[in-house]
Amino acid sequence: MALLEVSFSSQCLGRTVPMTVILPTDKQPMPGQQPRPRDLPYKTLYLLHGVYGSCTDWLCGTRIRWWAEARDLAVVMPSGENSMYLDNPAAAFGEFIGRELVDFTRRTFPLSQKREDTYIGGLSMGGFGALRNGLKYHETFGAIIALSAVAMLDADILNPSETSTLPIDRMAVRRWHYGNDLMAALESDRNPACLVKKLAEEGAEFPAIYMACGESDFLLEKNKAFHALLQTCHVPHTFELGPGSHEWDFWDRYLLKALNWLPLEIAAEGRGSGNVL
């Protein structure tokens, strides 16, 4: 397994941006096993962090590096700042995630070009980014994982709190994310709910969707509402609830469930940089 820290120049963001990449490339077969074909590209998960996070969050909070190696899965973890993974006046974070990042990593690493091998996931703000960009760029992504997601925009964004200790709750930041007309944002492609309705009306092919939320999570009702919308629009999906709140213990457990839900096979055992003999 190779763990890479990468910086590259992004045209969408207008600056150099960091990301962390897991590549299960150096695994040596055990005696009697056949090596993985060198020309076989890797299935890929683009994994997005939550608010105030960075491209190292998933490595620190979960066992993703071991689970990825066990499944011969490449994992790309970009730094999304506090952008909601939406295009804003200064940086096109949505296009960066949905187009530029995928194009760059496919050119740079041995990743599959196929939609059915390309997945996007995230937690909290990253879950929102995965839903929004997975749906907007549905021709690129074959599956979406949304854990404890800010699943949809609703009237809550019209009532910011200027006294909140969280900058993302303030009016200026919300207008930066969603535009000056917050009511219009509710009916735009910034809202995953609108994208669901639009794609359903068009008869488009939806990515497979996996959602999970803790039963004590403050975002539980938003997740239930989005689940109900998917049911109303007859969109196949998996929605799971379990004990826990907005915390890494829950995300670690349900990330494994999500990986088991993806069309991945457990790879043959081998020796790599993560093994100690």
What is the predicted function of each stretch?
Residues 1-277:
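Non-catalytic cap/lid and distal C-terminal segments of serine-dependent acyl enzymes
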